[in-house]
Amino acid sequence: MYMAIMIILFLSSILLSLLLLLRKHLSHFSYPNLPPGNTGLPLIGESFSFLSAGRQGHPEKFITDRVRRFSSSSSCVFKTHLFGSPTAVVTGASGNKFLFTNENKLVVSWWPDSVNKIFPSSMQTSSKEEARKLRMLLSQFMKPEALRRYVGVMDEIAQRHFETEWANQDQVIVFPLTKKFTFSIACRSFLSMEDPARVRQLEEQFNTVAVGIFSIPIDLPGTRFNRAIKASRLLRKEVSAIVRQRKEELKAGKALEEHDILSHMLMNIGETKDEDLADKIIGLLIGGHDTASIVCTFVVNYLAEFPHVYQRVLQEQKEILKEKKEKEGLRWEDIEKMRYSWNVACEVMRIVPPLSGTFREAIDHFSFKGFYIPKGWKLYWSATATHMNPDYFPEPERFEPNRFEGSGPKPYTYVPFGGGPRMCPGKEYARLEILIFMHNLVNRFKWEKVFPNENKIVVDPLPIPDKGLPIRIFPQS
């Protein structure tokens, strides 16, 4: 009898919890005049559909299917439920403009719980003032005049990378190599770290963290999220030690403010816990190499698919080489001449945006396109929604770098770096390392895809070729 009562109480508590969850879930969508759409299951919402679309090789499908069902050219907004939050997805140039121009007025940046649990203090700083100061510091460090001194360093790293990782190889898998290249540059630029063994050790932990950042936040042994949390603790310990050492070097006058971004931050950000600063550096390292490595990978892919584009890039880079003495490295003036090469990289980012989109949080109630968006709701904007829209880019499936000649795309249609106050501060940094990669690549090699008809892209959480892009390489004559 006692056991039966306990079982009934246990089952009743579970049922009550489920009913409360359902009530909370439904309460999010009880407001009048909300955008049309589906909310999915309680708590889970449509998160699995959102993630699985990318993992199945059709990252755009989640957005396009719902735009077709729920939106029109005039509304361009639908509701869903992602990562535990009611969410309005805005699409189109007008949606991008609305979010980017209302940053810190109606919306603020927001990250899923998985990000905040892995990086408690890096992605969301403790105050708006701290966030503003950090962005200002990054902008100062990443502006063109400040980056000039890194051209030679990046070029040297690129030459060494292609000599040790690509030369004398018949076949390579591109994506792991581009990650290695951009991570080496990030370690050198942000931490002045050059020891290959130490860089390799950090890279392994970073890769584990990057895979788990946008996973379902279930902290059970063996899950991506669990592995990412463990790896982030090891990274935090390692980078905190570097921070402490650099503080001592700055006190002793053994390091300069312009030495790297860590010194720059220590000299300007004020008193900060080593662990908090380590989280910020880790976040920057991930942002500073993951997205650029994706662009470099797909540059290799599209240059293999379109020989006439490869030839124009090669011609442009050969012209730069002709003006240089033997073994003379690249300079900032050379980067400025790589106009067609950058058009190619821009077209790559249009078709395969390295970041599909990001979230915002409504900090007040407001109306968009005639629909009510409650305070506390999350908003998601998608780069693909405009990049692959024929109204903005005719024949969007066609690879055409000349789209970026002259004045280029219309405002708010091409957004690989976001926009508004939250636009990626590392845009010029990314341009620099991508162009230096292209320069060294085409001047040394020709290549062909091992699987010429394999174009599947998996977004997990960032877009990568399904097989990592294996290619056969040949020395440039």
Swiss-Prot record:
<keyword id="KW-0408">Iron</keyword>
<feature type="transmembrane region" description="Helical">
    <location>
        <begin position="2"/>
        <end position="22"/>
    </location>
</feature>
<dbReference type="GO" id="GO:0006722">
    <property type="term" value="P:triterpenoid metabolic process"/>
</dbReference>
<dbReference type="GO" id="GO:0020037">
    <property type="term" value="F:heme binding"/>
</dbReference>
<dbReference type="Pfam" id="PF00067">
    <property type="entry name" value="p450"/>
</dbReference>
<protein>
    <recommendedName>
        <fullName>Cytochrome P450 716A1</fullName>
        <ecNumber>1.14.-.-</ecNumber>
    </recommendedName>
</protein>
<dbReference type="GO" id="GO:0016020">
    <property type="term" value="C:membrane"/>
</dbReference>
<dbReference type="InterPro" id="IPR001128">
    <property type="entry name" value="Cyt_P450"/>
</dbReference>
<dbReference type="InterPro" id="IPR036396">
    <property type="entry name" value="Cyt_P450_sf"/>
</dbReference>
<keyword id="KW-0349">Heme</keyword>
<dbReference type="GO" id="GO:0016709">
    <property type="term" value="F:oxidoreductase activity, acting on paired donors, with incorporation or reduction of molecular oxygen, NAD(P)H as one donor, and incorporation of one atom of oxygen"/>
</dbReference>
<dbReference type="GO" id="GO:0005506">
    <property type="term" value="F:iron ion binding"/>
</dbReference>
<dbReference type="InterPro" id="IPR002401">
    <property type="entry name" value="Cyt_P450_E_grp-I"/>
</dbReference>
<comment type="function">
    <text>Possesses triterpene oxidizing activity. Catalyzes the C28 hydroxylation of alpha-amyrin, beta-amyrin, and lupeol, producing uvaol, erythrodiol, and betulin, respectively. Catalyzes the C28 carboxylation of alpha- and beta-amyrin.</text>
</comment>
<keyword id="KW-0503">Monooxygenase</keyword>
<keyword id="KW-1133">Transmembrane helix</keyword>
<keyword id="KW-0560">Oxidoreductase</keyword>
<keyword id="KW-0812">Transmembrane</keyword>
<feature type="binding site" description="axial binding residue">
    <location>
        <position position="424"/>
    </location>
    <ligand>
        <name>heme</name>
    </ligand>
</feature>
<keyword id="KW-0472">Membrane</keyword>
<comment type="similarity">
    <text>Belongs to the cytochrome P450 family.</text>
</comment>
<dbReference type="InterPro" id="IPR017972">
    <property type="entry name" value="Cyt_P450_CS"/>
</dbReference>
<keyword id="KW-0479">Metal-binding</keyword>
